[in-house]
């Protein structure tokens, strides 16, 4: 489970329940079979005046808090380096403020140093991750413009620097390279063919799969099978989610209509989905995703994205300071609450029981990361 925003929403008043009983979200998820937590890391998610960017404000100290709770519950950790001060995805990959003006060689060294130094600090704090992804949704590269696709030499240079840094701290930590759009096989082949010619070896191909953006489940399966066979890598669905309602949650955010973005699952995106946006539809989707991963050779698990990001006043995908950094105009607010695994009041949804009760189709297969 990706739980990166949990500290923020808890501090703003979020509470979680299972069968009507309030509990710690980690306790609840542990009881539903969750064995691994994914946590993002931003370099410096603050304005020059120290105002948080929001969306979890996932700096190193927040990582330590969330990671400690995971380890206390016997969960492993996937660390998600963004190499940015805020969101890094196919639409934006901003260079961290402290690295602006660097050339490609300097950025390569900065990635190595930052990765190594943060991992060593995590190790000293007893929260070294068991799995690391070097970059987030690298479909169009990282640290633009020097690492923007089609600058594959620089993309490989930057990613490889991160991989070398991970290996220097602990050579046994598996490394993931993560792209979005898991149903787009030609894009994956093109990207990894270019990378394999230039970059350091790695262990896992990570995919994002959101059914309202990334094609059919059959297209995802085709891509997973091809990637596992073509490159000999394990496959993890690093981000996945499905909505449980199309009911609005404006009353929970307490924002004006011009100040909130609303949910990402617009009606035009979900009208052709194979699953209804209901608690039952969400549960059925998760059952089928787990079966798909289990059936694909090399399938190694999934991370449900932001399972606990329920709507509370003050928590959203960005603040005004963050918008300035990423050069976007907003509006802000939570756009993911109808895809959490808890309803708007924090009650566990049926999909969690589906995840817990899933039985592998083959005795020698199991979902390692969930």
Where are the regions a protein language model picked out?
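Conserved, mostly hydrophobic/aromatic
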Residues: 1, 29, 80, 132, ...
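Boundary/entry segment of secreted carbohydrate-active catalytic domains
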Residues: 1-25
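Active-site beta-loop-alpha junctions enriched in small/polar residues
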Residues: 4-6, 42-44, 82-84, 134-139, ...
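Aromatic-lined substrate-binding rim segments of carbohydrate-active enzymes
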Residues: 21-88, 151-172, 220-230
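Glycoside hydrolase catalytic-domain groove-lining segments
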Residues: 25, 170-174, 186-190, 194-271, ...
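Active-site cleft segment of glycoside hydrolase catalytic domains centered on the general acid/base Glu
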Residues: 53, 58-62, 88-202, 215-224, ...
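Substrate-binding cleft of secreted/luminal carbohydrate-active enzymes
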Residues: 212, 236-245, 258-362
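Conserved small/polar residues in nucleotide/adenosyl-binding loops
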Residues: 368-370
């Amino acid at each position: 489970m990706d739980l990166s925003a949990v500290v923020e929403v808890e501090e703003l008043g979020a509470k979680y329940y299972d069968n009507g009983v309030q509990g710690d979200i980690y306790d609840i998820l542990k009881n539903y079979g969750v064995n691994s937590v994914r946590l993002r890391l931003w370099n410096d998610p603050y304005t020059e005046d120290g105002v948080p960017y929001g969306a979890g404000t996932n700096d190193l100290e927040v990582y330590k808090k969330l990671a400690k709770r995971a380890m206390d519950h016997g969960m492993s950790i996937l660390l998600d380096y963004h190499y940015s001060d805020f969101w890094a995805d196919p639409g934006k990959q901003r260079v961290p403020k402290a690295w602006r003006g660097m050339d490609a060689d300097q950025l390569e060294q900065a990635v190595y140093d930052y990765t190594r130094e943060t991992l060593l600090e995590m190790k000293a704090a007893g929260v070294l991750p068991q799995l690391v992804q070097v970059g987030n949704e690298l479909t169009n590269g990282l640290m633009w413009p020097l690492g923007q696709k089609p600058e594959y030499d620089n993309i490989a240079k930057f990613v490889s620097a991160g991989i070398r840094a991970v290996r220097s701290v602990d050579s046994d930590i598996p490394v993931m390279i993560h792209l979005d759009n898991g149903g787009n096989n030609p894009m994956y082949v093109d990207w990894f063919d270019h990378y394999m010619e230039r970059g350091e070896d790695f262990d896992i191909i990570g995919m994002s799969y959101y059914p309202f953006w990334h094609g059919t489940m059959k297209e995802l399966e085709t891509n997973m099978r091809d990637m596992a066979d073509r490159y000999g890598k394990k496959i993890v669905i690093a981000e996945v989610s499905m909505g449980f309602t199309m009911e609005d949650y404006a009353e929970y955010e307490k924002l004006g209509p011009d100040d909130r973005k609303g949910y990402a699952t617009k009606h035009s995106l979900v009208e052709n989905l194979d699953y209804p946006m209901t608690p039952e539809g969400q549960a059925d989707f998760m059952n089928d995703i787990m079966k798909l991963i289990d059936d694909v050779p090399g399938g190694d698990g999934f991370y449900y994205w932001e399972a606990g990001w329920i709507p509370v006043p003050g928590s959203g995908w960005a603040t005004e300071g963050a918008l300035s950094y990423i050069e976007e105009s907003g509006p802000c607010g939570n756009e993911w609450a109808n895809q959490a695994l808890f309803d708007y009041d924090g009650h566990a949804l049926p999909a969690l029981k589906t995840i817990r009760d899933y039985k592998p189709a083959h005795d020698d297969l199991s979902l390692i990361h969930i």
